[in-house]
Amino acid sequence: MAKKVQAYVKLQVAAGMANPSPPVGPALGQQGVNIMEFCKAFNARTESLEKGLPIPVVITVYADRSFTFITKTPPAAVLLKKAAGIKSGSGKPNKDKVGKVTLEQVRQIAETKAADMTGSSIETKMKSIAGTARSMGLVVEE
């Protein structure tokens, strides 16, 4: 028989840097999960990624206090900021442009995020990423 799911916990944790301090500790402690066990497993799974990159993770907590987790790709905004070489997006994206990204960079980001995005073709995913870039005050160059 399948295990009974107690809760789903969604967090963003820096790759390779999970530790029992907030936000990880309180969120998992509330569910009665062994926090250090999660931290070790998460850090092991994300050691190949760039250290400090925020990684969305969905933790499934079962009634017997065991857990499984799924890591996703970093948010598009984080990848766009990295590609454009900026610290943060524009406060007024329609007026103040803070950087530029090329269509090739948008394609690479869309391919990276392909598994986590909806849309059938890479072109539709590129349009979505380009829209995110524009809403951050980035100019998408051909």
From Swiss-Prot:
Processing after translation: One or more lysine residues are methylated.
GO cellular component terms listed in the entry, alphabetical order: cytosolic large ribosomal subunit
Any one of the GO BP annotations: translation
PROSITE patterns linked to this entry: RIBOSOMAL_L11
Organism superkingdom: Bacteria
Pfam name, any one: Ribosomal_L11_N
Family annotation (InterPro entries): Ribosomal_uL11 (IPR000911), Ribosomal_uL11_bac-typ (IPR006519), Ribosomal_uL11_C (IPR020783), Ribosomal_uL11_C_sf (IPR036769), Ribosomal_uL11_N (IPR020784), Ribosomal_uL11_N_sf (IPR036796)
A molecular-function term among this protein's GO annotations: large ribosomal subunit rRNA binding
Keyword Transmembrane: no
Alphabetical keyword list: Methylation, Ribonucleoprotein, Ribosomal protein, RNA-binding, rRNA-binding
Family: Belongs to the universal ribosomal protein uL11 family.
Protein function: Forms part of the ribosomal stalk which helps the ribosome interact with GTP-bound translation factors.
Record note on quaternary structure: Part of the ribosomal stalk of the 50S ribosomal subunit. Interacts with L10 and the large rRNA to form the base of the stalk. L10 forms an elongated spine to which L12 dimers bind in a sequential fashion forming a multimeric L10(L12)X complex.
HAMAP family per record: Ribosomal_uL11
Name recorded for this polypeptide: Large ribosomal subunit protein uL11
